[in-house]
Amino acid sequence: MFIWDPRSKKCGERRKSLVQNIDMAPTILRYFGIEPPKDMQGFDLERTIRDDTPVREAALFGIHGGHVNVTDGRYVYMRGWVEGGEACHYNYTLTPMHIHTRFSVEELGQAEYVDGFSFTKGLKVLKVPGTGRGSSPQTRETFLFDLENDYGQMDPVQDSEVEERMIHYMLQLMQENDAPEPIFVSEGCCRN
């Protein structure tokens, strides 16, 4: 990520701290003296840019219907679906669209209104069973990569102690992100 923050007067330097794109909005808002909304995730990067002060221990990432991934900057853990996990895959939306098409009549016929999430500000959402691409895993494999020794993520490693720590980060961040219960089931995890 390339970022310039006039508050820091830093230019042409690298940082090692783990940041995410979601940190951009709070950084820009605070630069202009505006407090981010309470449900906005991410951190102001002013101190990270100035002197590499960390803002997080781990970051959650992935794509809808794919692996749930977490990194601590050293390791990347990619959690695959468990057998039968696709039965727990749903689309949660108020805009019943796939990327290129509307939801079908059959899909909408199976939809139900459910309580929303912290970021839907009290609105209920449609819960639609996942169908089509992105609703069944391309692989059920789980991977752990050591970026220090395999930056290209070509050779997964086996390390139960690291995997346990990464699962802890993943569960903690999924809970903080208000992940719906079925995703914990599809990934073979339980909430703490």
Which functions belong to the PLM regions below?
Residues 1-39, 43-53, 68, 79-81:
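Substrate-binding rim/cap in mid-to-C-terminal beta-strand-loop elements of soluble/periplasmic
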Residues 19-26, 43, 139-142, 151, ...:
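A structural signal for well-ordered alpha-helical segments within the folded catalytic domains
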Residues 25-29, 33, 46, 78, ...:
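Non-transmembrane alpha-helical segments in soluble domains
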Residues 35-36, 159-161:
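Structural helix-adjacent loops and short alpha-helical linkers that scaffold large soluble proteins
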Residues 49-52, 185-192:
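Amphipathic alpha-helical surface "interface" segments used
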Residues 56-60, 165, 181-184, 188:
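WW-domain-binding short linear motifs
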Residues 64-158:
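C-terminal, low-complexity/hydrophilic appendages and adjacent surface loops
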Residues 172-184:
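Bilobed periplasmic-binding protein-like "clamshell/Venus-flytrap" ligand-binding domains
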